[in-house]
């Protein structure tokens, strides 16, 4: 049973079972991963008291959750779904910034690697449908979420589908969160979602799209990158931080109207 602890920040995202082939053709099979894990690991040196909010099914290894607890994370917000869903992810890295996610059999064979039996039946197209599982999980204090998770002052949402992020924002607004940051999902970073994005950004302090996501969202409303960032900021968030891979970041501060180009 996860131990109760004092927490200052919540991070919400996915926990996944990853199968990775790196640029040198080396495989890393059945590894604990996911947006929640990577974000929490990056935040840990700066924020010690972190609560994790996610969902897993019954096949998710209990020892992975135990390791997170031993690292000092509060895992009481990780909810087990009674319905199984696709937790596996496959990444075949072509270079430091680009990877392929489908046809794992081809990539294992190409690199002369034995195919892991745990990856049998994996199809990339199953993931988007299974992400909707979030929408079927009741996340509230009445349904087992620790009250302390609503008493924090800050929260970050990792990439999740639109309806899930809206659901989590509504949940956090019922508590004491006053600093909310968001990393978007490809699912809604499209031009048809521009007007709906206000629902998510109205109370956010910072928004972290990739350059590709920003262009996909804003290309019908703006042409220049800084103009796109200003358009996003007008939807309610103060800081728009565009992630550009190895090229670093762009940041627009709507409060001061200042622009920054930052190295990696």
Language model segments and positions:
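Short catalytic helix/loop segments, enriched in acidic residues and glycine
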Residues: 25-41
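Conserved phosphate-binding/catalytic region of the ribokinase-like
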Residues: 2-7, 154, 171-174, 225-264
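Alpha-helix C-terminal capping segments
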Residues: 41-49
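A short acidic, amphipathic alpha-helical/loop segment
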Residues: 64, 164-172, 195-199
């Amino acid at each position: 049973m996860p131990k109760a602890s004092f927490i200052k920040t919540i991070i919400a995202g996915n926990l996944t079972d990853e199968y990775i082939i790196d640029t040198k053709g080396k495989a890393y099979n059945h590894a604990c991963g996911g947006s929640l894990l990577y974000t929490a690991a990056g935040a840990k040196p700066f924020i010690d008291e972190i609560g994790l909010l996610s969902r897993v099914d019954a096949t998710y290894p209990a020892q992975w959750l135990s390791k997170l607890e031993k690292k000092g994370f509060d895992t009481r917000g990780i909810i087990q779904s009674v319905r199984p869903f696709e937790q596996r992810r496959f990444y075949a890295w072509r270079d430091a910034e680009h990877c392929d996610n489908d046809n794992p059999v081809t990539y294992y064979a190409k690199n002369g690697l034995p195919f892991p039996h745990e990856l049998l039946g994996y199809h990339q197209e199953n993931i988007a449908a299974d992400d909707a599982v979030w929408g079927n999980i009741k996340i509230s204090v009445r349904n087992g979420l620790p009250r302390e998770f609503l008493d924090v002052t800050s929260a970050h949402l990792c990439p999740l589908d639109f309806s899930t992020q809206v659901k989590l924002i509504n949940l956090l607004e019922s508590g004491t969160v006053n600093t909310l940051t968001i990393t978007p999902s490809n699912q809604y970073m499209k031009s048809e979602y521009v007007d709906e994005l206000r629902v998510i950004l109205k109370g956010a302090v910072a928004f972290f799209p990739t350059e590709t996501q920003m262009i996909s969202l804003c290309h019908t409303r703006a042409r220049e990158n800084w103009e796109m960032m200003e358009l996003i900021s007008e939807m309610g968030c103060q800081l728009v931080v565009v992630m550009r891979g190895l090229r670093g970041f762009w940041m627009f501060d709507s409060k001061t109207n200042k622009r920054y180009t930052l190295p990696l």
